[in-house]
Structure formats: C-alpha cells, structure tokens
Amino acid sequence: MLRIAVQSKGRLFDDTMNLLSEADIKVSASKRTLLVQSSNFPLEVLYLRDDDIPQSVASGVADIGVVGENEFVERGEDADIISRLGFSQCRLSLAIPKEIEYRGVNWFNGKKIATSYPNILRNYMQEKGVECEIHVITGSVEISPGIGLADGIFDIVSSGSTLVSNNLREVEIVMNSEALLIGNKNLSADKRATLEEMLFRFKAVKDAEDKKYVRMNVPKARLQEIINVLPGLKSPTIIPLADDEWCSVHTVLDQKRFWEIIGKLKEMGAQGILVTPIEKMIL
C-alpha cells in the first residue's frame, strides 16, 4: 500500500484533500487520527507538519508527500519531484518597513533579517554578494521590524495583506512556490504502479480545470467558418439534426478565451448554446 504524507492543517491540507476527493480517492480528514486509510484506493494518508514532510519521504517513513516548494527547497532532503500540482501558490520575498527608501538588494548589507527560511535566504544573499545577519524565528515573522527585532523580513507572501497590516512592503521576490508531489527514490514496483494510477487520476482532474463543454446548434451553411474559430482538443463533434439546414456542434473551450469565442459563434449564427463544467478529462 502506498503512503502519502500530507500537511495536517492549513491551505495546503485543504487543497490536497480537494484533489484527492476530485480524483475519487476517499480519505477521512479527521484531525484526531494521524494515519488513515482510503476506503476505495490502496493509499494511506499520514498527517504531518509541513516541515516534517520532506524528511519523512526521503527516509521512507512515507512513500510520497505533498509539500510546498518553499519547504522542500529549504530542507534540502534527497527526494524526487514527481509532479508540480499547481495549487497553494505563493512566493518567498524580502520586505522592509514601507517608509524606508529602497535602492536595491545591497540595502541589506549589514542588516538583520528575520525569517523561517534561513537556507534559502543565505544562498540568495551569497549569490548577490550581500552580507547580512539572519535571525531565525518560527512564527509571526512579520512583526519583527515593528518590535525592533530585525530591519527586514524574508517570508511567504500570498496576497500581501499581512505585509500591509504590519506596515511592510515587498521589495524582492526570491522564489515562487507551489505544491509539489515528492517521492522516495526507492519505491517498489507495486508502489510505483499505484502511484501511476493516482497520477493518471490527478492529471484527468487538472486537465479539466478551466475547461467548458459547449454544445450549440449551427447553420450548416456556416459550419466550416464556425469550426475554424473553435480551438477544440481535436476535431469538434458534429451531429445532424431533424432540420437538414442545421447541425449540433460539441466542443471543449478554455475559460480564458470562452467569452471571446462565444461572441464570435453568436455572430456566425450559433443558437441554443449550452455550457457545462467538466469534472475530469482524459486525453
């Protein structure tokens, strides 16, 4: 049975459990149990702190794990990156009090920076040739400048609202981060087979994101024009109707261009346009 390490709470926990659910892998999300087994898939879920996940996977306590890229890089554990999952996106940034004039990263020479990510920060500053004092703290990094503990901070930024509420401004983006699926380097053949099945399901879910299934009635006289503006997966499905002068066209559209394309279709005479979301898409 495959064992996956998952963050025990927070946004990454929510996003991971949603992905498992959409892949029809049923798992209890009880906060009182650290190890639970799926009721319909050969998978155990081990709930851990996010900073413990890289080591648990590298050591073989867990076979695979979902972890923020920021934690994976910071810990430097020897595990494989299997897939980028595209959710729980954030960035690691340097921030300083907003009233301070900032002229570049050399401002941090001789300054004290508070962070929970000393390794990433140290490597970045060495690359930039900046000598600074790194003060490691594990929580509430953003209050450090306000209480005189540091001149600036290096921390996770999502919306930036926490920085604003603490009178700080972002001055350097050091790295972008998203959820990663990582794996132990020595998985057995059976576990790799289970992993491949899970990845197949994940891909079907991810491929369906921001896609719409569109059905419409179109005049046959303009059918080729309409086909030419459809950026479907391959060729759209054409179905004859009782009225010989009309046919039904089925296709898949990307949400990013949905309204642009729908407008063109209406101009070309498409009618009865029906739009439905797609749960999963197997290419």
Map each language-model feature to its residues.
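Active-site-flanking structural segment that lines cofactor/substrate pockets
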Residues: 37-55
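Small-molecule-sensing regulatory modules
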Residues: 1-43, 69-80, 85-91, 99-283
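Pocket-flanking alpha-helical
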Residues: 51-56, 61-78
